[in-house]
Amino acid sequence: RTAWLYSEFGKNFCKTMMSLTATKPQLKVVFDQCGTPTYALDLAKAIAQILDDYSKETKANNYFKTGVYHYSNEGVCSWYDFTKMIAEYNGTTACDVQPCHSNEFPSPVTRPSFSVLDKTKIKETFGIRIPYWTESLKQCITNIKNNK
C-alpha cells in the first residue's frame, strides 16, 4: 500500500501546486490532514529491490515472504506543509500560501486526518532504506525543472 503518490509525470498534487504557486497570488491549502508524500521513483526502486530479493529467495528456498506491505517516504506533513515545500524548492516566492481547515473544501468523501503508513514491516523484511519526503521532493522538482 502507498499514499500521496507524485512524480515528474502525469497529473498529481506536486505538479499542480508547482503551477498554482507560480501563477496565483494566494492559495489556501488544508493543514488538518496529515500523511506522507510518496515519490514514485522511490517506490519503483523499492519494488525493484523486492523483486530482486524475490528472485534470489525463490531460487534458493522455493519460498518468499508474502503479505501486505506499506511504503511511503519517511516523515509526516500536512497538505499545507507539502505545498510550502513545493513552492520553496520550486523557487516560488510570490504566492501567499495560507493554511485552512478541510471543512473549507467540502467533499462527498470523508478524508482521514492522519493517514501515515507504518513502514516497519517492509523495512525489516527487505532491508529497504526509505528517504525522507523532503529529500525526495527536492529531487523530483529538480528533475521536473531540468526536463522542461
Please report, for each region that a protein language model flagged, where it lies by residue.
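Residues that recognize and position ribonucleotide moieties
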Residues: 27, 36, 75, 98, ...
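Amphipathic terminal alpha-helices
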Residues: 133-148
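Residue-level signal for the nucleotide or nucleotide-sugar donor/cofactor binding architecture
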Residues: 35-38, 77, 117, 128-131
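Mid/C-terminal beta-alpha module of Rossmann-like enzyme folds, strongest
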Residues: 46, 53-108
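NAD(P)-dependent short-chain dehydrogenase/reductase
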Residues: 1-35, 40-49
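A general structural signal for well-ordered alpha-helical segments in protein cores
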Residues: 13-14, 40, 44, 79-83, ...
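A hydrophobic C-terminal alpha-helical subdomain
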Residues: 103-123
